[in-house]
C-alpha cells in the first residue's frame, strides 16, 4: 500500500488526501455492509471486510449481479461518475487516475455509515451502480457475503447470441 510520500506530488510533498493509510487502524477486525443497486427494485447488500481491497469489492459486486468480469471498472467516492477528484480505477487504466483498486483497501477510502459512492463497470456499456454504506459491523468476514438480495439483475449481454 502507498504511504504519504508515495502519494506525494512531483516535489515529494504529500498531497492532502482523504484516502489515508492511517484510517485503516480503527477499522481493523470490522466489516462494512454496503448496499449496491443497479436500478429501482434491484439491489444487493454485501458484507465485506473493511480490510478488503477495492478490487475485492468489485469482484463481489460482479459476482452478486451475475456478470462476467471482462471489462474495466472504477469507483467514484465523490458519487459522481467520471469524476477525477476521488476515484479509483482498475490497474491498466491509470490514465484516468493514479489510484488503482488493487492497491487501496476499503478502510482507506473514507467510508462511513451513510457514505454514497458510485461504481462503474464496462466503460463502453457503462453499467452504473449506486453504493451506500449501510453499517459498520464489529465483526470481520473472511470473504464477501450477500446478506440481502432483491430483484433480478439484467442480462449483461442481452443481444448476444450463442452461435
Region locations from a protein language model:
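Short linear regulatory motifs enriched in tryptophan with gly/pro/ser
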Residues: 1-163
Amino acid at each position: 500500500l502507498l504511504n504519504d510520500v508515495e502519494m506525494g506530488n512531483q516535489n515529494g510533498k504529500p498531497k492532502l488526501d482523504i484516502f489515508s493509510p492511517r484510517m485503516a487502524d480503527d477499522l481493523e477486525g470490522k466489516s462494512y455492509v454496503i448496499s449496491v443497486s443497479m436500478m429501482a427494485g434491484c439491489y444487493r447488500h454485501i458484507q465485506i471486510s473493511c480490510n478488503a481491497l477495492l478490487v475485492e469489492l468489485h469482484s463481489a459486486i460482479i459476482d452478486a449481479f451475475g456478470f462476467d468480469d471482462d471489462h474495466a471498472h472504477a469507483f467514484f467516492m465523490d458519487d459522481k461518475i467520471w469524476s477525477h477528484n476521488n476515484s479509483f480505477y482498475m490497474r491498466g487504466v491509470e490514465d484516468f487516475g493514479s489510484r488503482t483498486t488493487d492497491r487501496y483497501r476499503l478502510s482507506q477510502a473514507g467510508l462511513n455509515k451513510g457514505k454514497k459512492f458510485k461504481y462503474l463497470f464496462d466503460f463502453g456499456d457503462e453499467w452504473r451502480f449506486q453504493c451506500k454504506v449501510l453499517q459498520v459491523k464489529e465483526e470481520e468476514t473472511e470473504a464477501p457475503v450477500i446478506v440481502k438480495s432483491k430483484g433480478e439483475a439484467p442480462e449483461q449481454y442481452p443481444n448476444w447470441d450463442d452461435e
